[in-house]
Amino acid sequence: MCVPSQVRQIDKTTINFNINLNKQKTMNYPIGKRVIVRTNRAGVFYATLSDFDAQTRIAELKDCRRIHYWEGACSLSQLAEEGTKNPDSCRFSMYVPVMQVMETIEIIPCSDKAIKIIEGVEIWKK
């Protein structure tokens, strides 16, 4: 059986929970920085992040390369932080001036070291 003090406690918890759900956290996206972007279906990209809409998950990219295949890093996190140890084995596409990608899953800022290595990878074409 519920006593009135328990009911009030439950109500306060519910109210606090709902208030916390309604608070929106403001994210600072690395606009203007070189990033690696992973999408749900379009793949992985290296680019300058021009804009990002968190509600639609659409990222606008500038000077963009598709990362088709890489070796020399175990993950995109390592690639963004350290670059690749095997640049000759990587398949990075030609640059595209502007691109929009949907269903963005990850935006990983690149370190200066990684930028230098990634931009040194030769363009892969067939």
Regions found by a protein language model. Give the residues of each.
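Conserved RNA-binding domains used in RNP assembly and mRNA/RNA metabolism
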Residues: 24-126
